[in-house]
Regions:
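Short loop/turn motifs that connect adjacent beta-strands in outer-membrane beta-barrel proteins
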Residues: 25-28, 43-52, 64-66, 97-107, ...
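Transmembrane beta-strands of outer-membrane beta-barrel pores
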Residues: 59-65, 112-118, 151, 166-172, ...
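Transmembrane beta-strands of outer-membrane beta-barrel proteins
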Residues: 53-57, 104-112, 158-164, 188, ...
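Outer membrane beta-barrel transmembrane domains
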Residues: 30, 68, 74-76, 219-321
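Residues on the lipid-exposed face of transmembrane beta-strands in outer-membrane beta-barrel proteins
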Residues: 44-46, 57, 90-95, 145-151, ...
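Outer-membrane pore/translocation modules
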Residues: 104-107, 113-223, 268
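Residues that define the transmembrane beta-barrel architecture of outer-membrane proteins
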Residues: 51, 83-91, 134-144, 182-188, ...
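Surface-exposed strand-loop-strand hairpins of Gram-negative outer-membrane beta-barrel proteins
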Residues: 28-34, 61-88, 123-135, 178
Length: 321
């Protein structure tokens, strides 16, 4: 069970490729499916060699903006700048399958997300005047599932996990609204995670990288270009179950968005970087169960055509049994 405990963050790292509601977002609405710095989890590359169930609850809050000098694609039109607040709650269930001893282990997962979002924008009204608008949405978000998560153990201190993750457009969407509890597209994310443990120093390195492929939003005729994302986390573990470290993350757009609005904005290509601290706590419970808690703050340190946030906070709680 000790190995199962260590693997909790690993499989959940593959589950929490977090998506965000459309204020349309480089990328329609200026965000996309993942928030920089929130994807990597402790033990990211480890899939448990023991059959387990894991239940995870995650809460993320973000308050971001793009300056008013930039046009942002949103809901089939453009806004001069954008301010968005998002509170995201995710409940995830994961099953690691009993595949017996060996270097490979496998898991599957399902996530039910709920979102609250408020968007403020400035659009061009009649006569060319700028008009401020505000919109709020609160509902179930697009469903997220990982049909296959494959973990490979190079050694007791070196692990890798491969996954194929899917966001389905199950949330409500209205192209006339600025805030929507859906991106109104399918998103496919192949992802690789790696964990390296240094037992002598109590240091651990975790990294997660993936590429997001989007289908077209047929309601706005907008298609996001593929996005490359990578988060790296280094932590120092202590004997009392507490760890502390830093996270560095980036999202880089690999091409231009397409569609009439994107073409007018020259593809609206974007990128960003985030850097911030993380604190975690792991505790063994009775009957081979375990509890893992985490709290991070990952503010944006550089951003182009993506929401810039100094208030991105994520809290997680995971029970393994």
């Amino acid at each position: 069970m000790q190995n199962a405990i260590a693997a909790v963050g690993g499989v959940l790292a593959l589950l929490l490729g977090l998506a965000w509601p459309a204020a349309g977002w480089a990328t329609e609405g200026a965000l996309g499916r993942q928030i920089t710095g929130t994807n990597v989890q402790p033990n990211a590359g480890i899939v448990s060699p023991e059959p387990i169930w894991a239940v995870n609850f995650a809460e993320i809050y973000m308050d971001g903006s793009i300056g008013g000098s930039r046009e942002v694609p949103i809901g089939g039109r453009t806004s001069l700048g954008l301010d968005a607040k998002v509170a995201f709650t995710l409940a995830t269930v994961l099953k690691t399958w009993d595949t017996g001893p060996g270097r490979w282990n496998f898991a599957s997962s399902f996530t039910l997300p709920y979102v609250w979002t408020k968007v403020n924008s400035t659009v061009t009204g009649p006569g060319g005047r700028s008009v401020g608008q505000s919109d709020t949405a609160s509902n179930l978000f697009d469903l997220y599932f990982s049909p296959i998560i494959a973990g490979y153990h190079f050694s007791e201190t070196s692990h890798m996990a491969l996954s194929f993750n899917v966001w389905a457009p199950t949330g409500k969407y209205n192209a006339n609204d600025m805030a929507n509890p859906s991106l109104n597209n399918w998103t496919f994310i192949p992802q690789v995670a790696y964990t390296k443990i240094f037992p002598e120093s109590g240091f651990q390195l975790d990294t997660v990288a993936g590429i997001q492929f989007y289908t077209r939003n047929n309601a706005t005729d907008y298609r996001n270009a593929p996005l490359f994302s990578m988060d790296v986390m280094g932590r120092k573990m202590f004997s009392n179950g507490v760890s502390a470290g830093l996270i560095l993350g980036t999202i880089q757009q690999l091409g231009n968005d397409s569609g009439p609005t994107a073409d007018r904005l020259n593809g609206f290509k974007g990128r960003d970087w985030a850097l911030g601290p993380i604190v975690t706590y792991d505790r063994k419970l009775a009957d081979k169960r375990s509890l893992s808690l985490g709290l991070r703050w990952v503010p944006t340190i550089s951003s182009t055509n993506r929401l810039d946030s100094s208030s991105t906070v994520m809290a997680t709680a995971t029970l393994v049994f």
